[in-house]
A protein has these predicted regions:
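Short active-site neighborhood of thiol/selenol oxidoreductases, capturing the structured segment around
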Residues: 52-72, 77, 90-95
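Loop/turn elements at helix/coil->beta-strand transitions in domains of secreted/extracellular proteins
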Residues: 55-59, 85-90, 118-123, 166-169
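Short, internal strand/loop/helix patches
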Residues: 108-157
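Thiol-based oxidoreductase modules, predominantly thioredoxin-like and allied folds used
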Residues: 63, 88-105, 120-132
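Bacterial Sec-dependent N-terminal signal peptides
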Residues: 1-25
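Thiol-/selenol-based redox modules, centered on thioredoxin-like
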Residues: 137-140, 144-191
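N-terminal "domain-start" segment that seeds a small globular fold
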Residues: 19-52, 72, 137
Length: 191
C-alpha cells in the first residue's frame, strides 16, 4: 500500500512539473518583444513620420533640448548623420522639455533653432515628454524591458541615445554625456 502511494505521488508530481513547464514556455512566447517599427509620430513640421520606413537601417534616437549645456551635441549628431546616412544610419531627434525646462520653444521655434545654429537635416520629431506620467509611447518602448526586451532604463538627461538595430530592436542605451562621435557609437555603426 505504501509503495502504491509513493508511486502515485511521483507520477502526479511529474505531471504537475510538465504542466508548469508548458505554462512557463507559453508565457515566455506571449511576451514577444516589440520593435520600433510600430510607431508613427509627427515631425516638427507636423508631417507624419512612420518608423516602419526605416526597416533595415540602424537608428539612433536622441532626446534633445535647445538650452542645455549638451546642446552643442547637435553639431556632432549632424556630422555623424552626414558621414553615415548613406551607410544605413538614421538619427531621429525628439525635443523634450523634461529637464530644467531646457526646451521651452514651440515646434516651429525648435526647427528654426536647429537649422540656423546647427544645420540639422536629420529627422526631428514634434516635442514630446520622455518621462513621467505623460511619457510618449516611443519612450515607453525605449525605457521598458517588457516592451524592448533589453533593459529597463530611465532617461537621465537631455541627449540620451538609444541605439536600434536593423531589425528594429533596442540594442544599447548611451549616456547623455557620451558624445555621438564616441568610439562605442562609431563601432556600433560600423559593426
Amino acid at each position: 500500500m505504501f509503495l502504491a502511494i509513493v508511486v502515485s505521488f511521483i507520477a502526479c508530481n511529474k505531471k504537475i512539473n510538465k504542466n508548469m513547464n508548458a505554462i512557463a514556455s507559453t508565457s515566455l512566447e506571449s511576451q514577444e518583444i516589440e520593435d520600433i517599427y510600430q510607431f508613427k509620430v509627427k515631425t516638427l513640421n507636423d508631417e507624419d513620420f512612420d518608423f516602419s520606413t526605416l526597416k533595415g537601417k540602424k537608428i539612433m534616437i536622441v532626446n534633445t533640448a535647445s538650452k542645455c549645456g549638451l546642446t552643442p551635441q547637435y553639431e556632432d549628431l549632424q556630422n555623424l548623420y552626414d558621414t553615415y546616412k548613406n551607410e544605413n544610419l538614421v538619427i531621429v531627434g525628439f525635443p523634450a522639455n523634461n529637464f530644467a525646462k531646457q526646451e521651452p520653444g514651440t515646434n516651429a521655434e525648435i526647427a528654426e533653432f536647429c537649422l540656423i545654429n546647427y544645420g540639422v537635416t536629420f529627422p526631428m520629431m514634434a516635442k514630446i515628454s520622455v518621462k513621467g506620467d505623460d511619457i510618449h509611447p516611443v519612450y515607453q518602448f525605449l525605457t521598458q524591458k517588457s516592451k524592448n526586451g533589453l533593459e529597463d532604463s530611465e532617461v537621465s538627461w537631455n541627449f540620451q541615445k538609444y541605439l536600434i538595430n536593423e531589425e528594429g530592436h533596442l540594442v544599447k542605451v548611451i549616456s547623455p554625456k557620451t558624445l555621438p562621435t564616441d568610439e562605442e557609437v562609431i563601432g556600433w555603426i560600423k559593426g
